[in-house]
């Protein structure tokens, strides 16, 4: 059980810690905590919370992680940062998982992935977002080559703990499509990406992307296995459980 992305800019981390600890206790220690710095300006505008520059939001996220871990620890916790001040907060209840539930951080840029490498247990490999009033995916960051670069950043920042990290990916280059003609679907996908972003990706780059899942049941089973072997990715968020159920059966026991 877990959250994919909780926008910490919309929630005070000390209050969030109590909510998350309660969920972990009630679930018998099954919670995973997905956190993020926020990216969707309209989400902020709708409730009157300023949408700050990305660097400020990442600093808020960094402080929030420190506060969550402090609140989950034993005894009162105090913290004085640029964005939050905590004074003698007990942080009850405490989570069932000690020292805390696994933290899931993801991103496509070096700053967020470096933070994730230092603080998280699960790291989501995401495409980079081009900032603006309506952020959009940088299509170039969907490729396998871009993923290799992201993993290098993570390895450098994680140091000795790299082997303890779980790497995750999910379909952000379009929906999962089960088909016996993957190249035709990949050409359509490449055409849409070119029309929307101006970026030219080849059919091979589309099919090779860790963020695109197109092919037959056997194709997709091979791809999941290849992502584990090639990149060390062992965690996947999928967008169509029914379509991929045969893939899971194909991979059972591997």
Locations of regions flagged by a protein language model:
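Active-site-adjacent structural elements that line small-molecule/cofactor binding pockets in enzymes
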Residues: 1-254
